[in-house]
Design a protein with these regions (language model features):
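Conserved glycine-rich cofactor-binding loop
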Residues: 10, 17-19
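Alpha-helical segment proximal to the catalytic Tyr-Lys
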Residues: 133, 177-181, 239
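Active-site helix of classical SDR
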Residues: 128, 164, 172
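Catalytic Tyr-X3-Lys loop
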Residues: 106-125, 140, 144, 168, ...
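Residue(s) in the substrate-gating loop at a strand-loop-helix junction
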Residues: 148
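Conserved mid-core segment of classical short-chain dehydrogenase/reductases
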Residues: 72, 94-114, 157-160, 200-203
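Short C-terminal tail/terminal secondary-structure segment
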Residues: 2, 153, 231, 242-255
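The beta1-alpha1 cofactor-binding region of Rossmann-like NAD(H)/NADP(H)-dependent oxidoreductases
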Residues: 43, 62-74, 223-224
Length: 255
């Protein structure tokens, strides 16, 4: 277990009512950070997360991150609640099939494609922009974007997802080069399949066995493994890894 002290540090974790976001919020709080838990639809779950976090001063906010203006307001609201923002974790995302095989009408396909890009790329970009304004004023900070293995190998039936995550990796690298002078570091994590509610339909039966067999470890990642990577990247020890994309895929895809 990584041992770090995040006392007097604050974090906004998007999509933290469940899955990787929840595990990340819990780990940051255990390390001493005050955490703002963001959700869109899981209000009950988000309240449960906040109630279970160790320490005091945590908060909860709702926002639709497919709207970049809402993403900007979310960051400002988190700063108001927390007093400052040291760590932004752009974790929220959607994974909705939109194949190009003609099974969807064009308008439906385009709407799903656009919503995927907005939620998985444009929203994090807007949140990062606003977080940088606050971090610059206070002398620095850290942004961590949760990307995907799909950015490298593509996602059949999910062209918007793969494109958005590839864009998120590139966004992270470009921001790292631009804001390093302001003592702001930017990182990305590229997990493969993770044992989450969103991935569960893909991990059942023979199809699930095939997914697990992609890794020589014959399993998928846990949410805690990804959360521990976030904790490391948010720590001072990881500062010189700014601009990197950390793979967490159990050697299921190497490049």
């Amino acid at each position: 277990m990584i041992t770090v002290d995040f006392s007097n540090r604050t974090a906004l974790v998007t999509g933290s009512s469940r899955g990787v976001g929840r595990a990340t919020a819990e780990l940051l709080a255990r390390a001493g950070a005050r955490v703002c838990v963001h959700y869109l639809n899981g209000e009950r779950e988000a309240k449960e997360v906040v109630a279970g976090l160790p320490g005091a001063g945590h908060s909860i906010l709702k926002a639709d991150l497919s709207d970049p203006r809402a993403a900007r307001i979310l960051v400002d609201s988190a700063v108001t609640k927390l007093g400052k923002l040291d760590i932004l974790v752009n974790n929220a995302g959607i994974f909705r099939r939109h194949p190009v095989d003609g099974s969807m009408a064009f308008d439906e396909w385009l709407a799903t494609f656009q919503q995927t890009l907005n939620t998985n790329l444009v929203g994090p970009a807007a949140a990062s922009f606003q977080a940088i304004q606050h971090m610059r004023q206070r002398g620095g900070g850290t942004i961590i974007n949760i990307g995907s293995r799909g950015a490298y190998r593509g996602e059949e039936g999910q062209v918007g997802y793969g494109a958005a995550k590839a864009g998120l990796h590139s966004l992270s690298q470009s921001l790292a080069r631009e804001v390093g002078k302001d003592n702001i570091t930017v990182h990305a994590i590229a997990p493969g399949f993770i044992e989450t509610a969103m991935a569960r339909p893909h991990l059942q039966g023979a199809a699930g066995e095939a997914v697990r067999a992609q890794s020589p470890l014959n399993r998928v990642a846990t949410v805690e493994e990804v959360a521990r990577a976030v904790l490391y990247l948010a720590s001072p020890e990881a500062k010189f890894t700014t601009g990197s994309v950390l793979d967490i895929n159990g050697a299921s895809y190497l490049h």
